[in-house]
Amino acid sequence: MMLERTTAAIGPLDEQAMATAADLQSRLTKPAGSLGVLEELSVRLAGLAGVCPPPLPEPAAVAVFAGDHGVHAQGVTPWPQEVTGQMIGNFLAGGAVVNAFARQTGATVTVVDVGVAAPPTSIETAPPESATASGARPRLVEANIRRGTRDLTVTAALTRDEARAAVETGIRVADELVDAGAAILLTGDMGIGNTTPAAALIAVFAEADPATVTGRGTGVDDPTHQRKIEVVRAALRRHEPDPADPLGVLAAVGGLEHAALAGLILGAAAQRVPVLLDGVIADSAALAAAAFAPSATGAMVAGHRSVEPGATVALRRLGLTPLVDLGLRLGEGTGALLALPVVAGAVRVLHEVATFDSAGVAQK
């Protein structure tokens, strides 16, 4: 089956390529280690690609997975559920923050409806001004598995078959984007209420207390935040999800966009293409992906540190260092897009910077 074939194809980083990259970094015209995290990142990307220098992360593709959540009925957010579908229309019209940042970086935007409760509204042909520098306009992939998840405090959010379908949708999207030429994939998400299942997923996979991983999402007040924590606790008590069964965890307390993002990450890792994580939704999905295939972490790059507390817990569990910390909590892929030039810079150093010998520069 697709999921099993994909996880079987995910292997470890190429140690020889990493050693070559580390050696090259030590001979470039700069003090050893002076580029900090960027040096470590360039070495890891060489290991992922199996060659030094690794390919430049161009062109880039953002995949924004959208879904709704039955737990919305528990009052975990003041935002109405129909905003999810309305925002899809905004993405396709080029009017969201993700579109502005994508135009700045030249990344394409693909919006994937995996579980929106109501058909997306205001979907029209994207205007010319929504296009990136390459001329690509935002596009919609209709892959709705069900019209929103079930309320995870009452029953499992998804069946195992639905969770598998979402994961495999993400794998297919990764395959399609890479086949179309993408050299790096960026995670995006849209779903009113989706930080609640994200907190539940992180609590399970990181073995953390819900109070330490449940944040304020869109900025809820204290009573709503406390209710949200209790909702996560109640869901975990009801389902007792087993972190050794990632498909079961996604079915019990996940969301369709979380499962699809896990699939996107697995698909990228199987193709040995880096995937740049956005915020807490992507971080929770990355934990699920790592539970399916531990070596998938080799393809993951943490774009930024979300202010959602679960993001820090998840990244620590994954062993990933966020590239930027700007106090973001929007989602959509915005933080990943802001970090994209940092990733490109890390790789470009290996391609373009002279060595001490080639430049005729003396060493200490």
Swiss-Prot record:
E.C. number(s) listed in UniProt: 2.4.2.21
Active-site residues, Swiss-Prot/TrEMBL: 332 (proton acceptor)
GO molecular function terms attached to this record: nicotinate-nucleotide-dimethylbenzimidazole phosphoribosyltransferase activity
Pathway it works in: Nucleoside biosynthesis; alpha-ribazole biosynthesis; alpha-ribazole from 5,6-dimethylbenzimidazole: step 1/2
Protein origin, superkingdom: Bacteria
GO BP term (any one): cobalamin biosynthetic process
Transferase in keyword set: yes
A Pfam family that the UniProt record links to this protein: DBI_PRT
Keywords: Cobalamin biosynthesis, Glycosyltransferase, Transferase
Catalyzed reactions per annotation: 5,6-dimethylbenzimidazole + nicotinate beta-D-ribonucleotide = alpha-ribazole 5'-phosphate + nicotinate + H(+)
Family label: Belongs to the CobT family.
Biological role: Catalyzes the synthesis of alpha-ribazole-5'-phosphate from nicotinate mononucleotide (NAMN) and 5,6-dimethylbenzimidazole (DMB).
Protein name: Nicotinate-nucleotide--dimethylbenzimidazole phosphoribosyltransferase
Name of the coding gene: cobT
